C-alpha cells in the first residue's frame, strides 16, 4: 500500500501551482493502469459474473476529454463577453463625443453601475489578461478628443475617394485637403467643417427678419458731415441683424484686421451701429401649491369674518298671482325602498314554503336533507308513506300571488267534523315555529284525494311541463357525450375489476409453461386462449425475461414471413430478481 500511495501522491494531493498539471503524463499512467486492470480478474458467483474495469477506465478518459472541451469553451466565452463590453463602451464614448463637440463630458456608462471596465491591458511576454475595476469615488480623467481634421486618415480611406485633375491625373485623395472634408445636412448641402453646423441656428433666426432693398452708397466724408456719421432716415429701414454668437470659433481682433486692410479712398459702406441685445426678463417661478394644506384642520385661511344676521322679507300676497308662466320645478326624488327593490331584484322566485327573501333560498335548499328527514319521521308515526320527490316538490314549489288559500274539505257529506284533528294544534304549538308552515303544506299534500279534480289536472300539467323542458334543452352534443359515456363505462368497469399487473408473476407463468431448460415453444402456444389484454401482459413479461437472459427470443427471417412466428427458448430457471436478493459481494481482502 505504501508503494501505491507514493506512486500516486501527485494525483491524490491538491496541486497549488496549476502549471504543474501539464508536467503529469496522464496517458502513460492511464495505460499502465489499464494493463493492470486487464490482467486483474474479479469474479462473482464462481466465475459467472466478471467485472470489467477496462471499460470503466475508458469511460472516465472520455468524460475527462469532454470536460476539458467544456472548460475551454467557457474560457473562450468569458473573453468574448469582455471584448463585447469593452467595444460597447468605446462606441458609446464615440457617440457622446460626436454629439457634444468640443465640450467636456464625463465617460459613458450608466449611473447605476458601481464599477466600470477598463481597457484590457495585455503584456507582450505574458499571455494573461489583467482586468482592473474602477473605484467610483476616484476623480475621472477627462481625455480631450482631437479635431477630426487633425486625425490622419488611413491608407485604405485615401484610396476610397481619389482626387483627379482635369487631365485625369491623380493628385491625391480628398482626405489630404482640409477644404474637401464636408458633411451632408438634411437639405442635401455640403457643409465644410463643423463651423457651419454652429451657424445653422443663426441662419434660421435671420430668415425671420424683414429684407429691404439696398440703399445707394454715399461718400464717407459727406455722410459723416450731413448726419453726424450716419444717415438716420436710411438706417431706419435698414435690416437689423442679431449678433453672432460665439460657438467655439476664433474671432480675429480689431488690430489684426486694421493691419491687413488696404488703404482705399473710394466709396465705402457706412458703418452699421451695434445692436444692443434685448435683455430677457427672468421668468417668475410659479408658486407651488400644497395639495394637503386644505386638509389641515388646524390651518387658518384668511381672516375670520364676523357673523351678520340676515334680514327676512315677507313676500306680498299678490306677487304669486301674476300672469307669468311658472317654470317646472325639479322632479321629486324617488322613494328609496322602491328604487332599491327594482335595482337589486333577483331572478330567484320566492318559494311558497321558503324564506321571506329569495336571496336566502340557497340556505333553505342546503338544509333540505334535514327537513326531509324530520318530516319522514313524523309521517311514519302517522302511518303515511310519501316519496322523497313529492316532499321535495312541496318545499320547492314557487309562490303564486294569484293563488288563494284553499279550504281543506272534510270527507263528511254533512260538513260536520267529528274527528280528533282539532287537538293536533296543541301538539303543533309545542314544536318550533319555523316548521308550522311546512307541516301545513305537507298535510295538504297528503290529502290529495280530498282535492278537487281541477286542482289535480293543474298539478299534472305542471309536472308534464317540467319534465318536457329536459328534452327541449337536450342537444346533439349532449347526446353524443351521453353515447360516449355509455360506450366507455363498461370498459372502465372491466379495468376496475381486472387484477393488478405483476410482471414477475407473469414471468413465472411463462417459465412454468416452458417447463425445462432448452425447451423451445412459440409465443402463440403460451398465450393460447387468453384475452387481448392478457396477451399484452404476457408479451411484456417475455421481453423482461429476454432482457434478463432467462429466455431467448427467435423468429423466422423475412418481413412478411416473420409475422406471428415469435418463439421462446428457456435458458435458465433461476430468475434475475431472485439472484439479486441472494447476491453477496466479495470483500476487498478476498480479491487476489
UniProtKB/Swiss-Prot annotation:
Superkingdom of the organism of origin: Eukaryota
Region feature Disordered, mapped onto this chain: 89-116, 261-285
GO biological process: meiotic chromosome condensation; mitotic sister chromatid separation
Gene Ontology MF term list: chromatin binding
One Pfam family linked to the record: CNDH2_N
Ranges of compositional bias, category Polar residues: 96-108
Subcellular location as annotated: Nucleus
Sorted UniProt keywords: DNA condensation, Nucleus
Gene Ontology, cellular component aspect: condensin complex; nucleus
Assembly description: Component of the condensin-2 complex, which contains the smc2 and smc4 heterodimer, and three non SMC subunits, ncapg2, ncaph2 and ncapd3 that probably regulate the complex.
UniProt record similarity statement: Belongs to the CND2 H2 (condensin-2 subunit 2) family.
Function statement: Regulatory subunit of the condensin-2 complex, a complex that seems to provide chromosomes with an additional level of organization and rigidity and in establishing mitotic chromosome architecture.
UniProt protein name: Condensin-2 complex subunit H2
